[in-house]
Amino acid sequence: MLDKLPTEQRNPKTMDIDTKSIKEILEMMNREDFTVPQTVQKEISFIEEAVHRTIHSFKSNGRLIYIGAGTSGRLGVLDASECPPTFGVSSEMVKGLISGGLEAITKAKEGAEDSEAMAKQDLLDIKLTEHDTVIGIAASGRTPYVKGALSYANEIGASTVAISNNKNSEIGKIAEIAIEAETGPEVITGSTRLKAGTAQKLILNMISTASMIGVGKVYENLMVDLKPTNKKLVDRSKRIIMEATQVDYTTAENYLQKANNSVKTAIVMILLNCNVDEAIQHLDRAEGFIRKTK
């Protein structure tokens, strides 16, 4: 039953929050938020498994698919939408699906989460394959939409991961990998957009970032597959080249032009003292990893 879940219980530390000053309310919330990273830390071994599955999908021309309802769905859409500008990947490589469709991102459509069949249809619409990794997200761990998504993904042989905020969750029993960051009672009873949502965001950050590092999208700690699509990003691209190769701004600018605005190619051209075609060949042989071109 929903009312038995830790995330739905009343928090004894905030029973009188409505009598507090604004500063005291903020301090209460901050104290509760401090507990979230520790709950995530306990799940790192399971998060690691999820990253390995995701990297395998990427190397098999598969995708990472986040799916959820409400806040959980929105967080998946958010993380997916940040991957193209950060890592220079196609918007198809990491996708976020939310019950009720894109309209549900800005307007709550709470009833949409109750349909398992809708989740299957949403995955059919994007032509889910066995090469994909599906990550179902639900604070309660029992959302029908997410259960339906994971069940269908299992049927066709995709990798499945469940992220929830309660132990022994229903979605955790369906998925191959269960990440269960038990964040406990919320500051406001049942408002899982708070600690539960924060834990989910941290976990999604870890999965997408570590997976992209695992397929060569990062050199040192630099975003070397960044696409310079506006003035700010053009300037950032030049500075990334400068950091990676220790050249000056003008040299970085020249190489970025020679490399047809590919930061990664420009870096390899400088590091290996080669032309653009040779740099591309080096990167192809190294599967996109700059370190492996040396």
Swiss-Prot record:
Protein name: N-acetylmuramic acid 6-phosphate etherase
Stored SUPFAM superfamilies: SIS domain
Keyword Lyase attributed: yes
Enzyme class: lyase
Classification via CDD domains: SIS_Etherase
Subunit details: Homodimer.
KW Metal-binding (keyword) present: no
GO molecular function, one term: carbon-oxygen lyase activity
InterPro entries: Etherase_MurQ, Glucokinase_regulatory_CS, MURQ/GCKR, SIS_dom, SIS_dom_sf
Reaction catalysed by this enzyme: N-acetyl-D-muramate 6-phosphate + H2O = N-acetyl-D-glucosamine 6-phosphate + (R)-lactate
Active site annotation, chain numbering: E82, E113
PROSITE patterns: GCKR, SIS
Taxon lineage: Bacteria, Bacillati, Bacillota, Bacilli, Bacillales
Native organism: Oceanobacillus iheyensis (strain DSM 14371 / CIP 107618 / JCM 11309 / KCTC 3954 / HTE831)
Function comment: Specifically catalyzes the cleavage of the D-lactyl ether substituent of MurNAc 6-phosphate, producing GlcNAc 6-phosphate and D-lactate.
Keyword terms, alphabetized: Carbohydrate metabolism, Lyase
Domain of life of the source: Bacteria
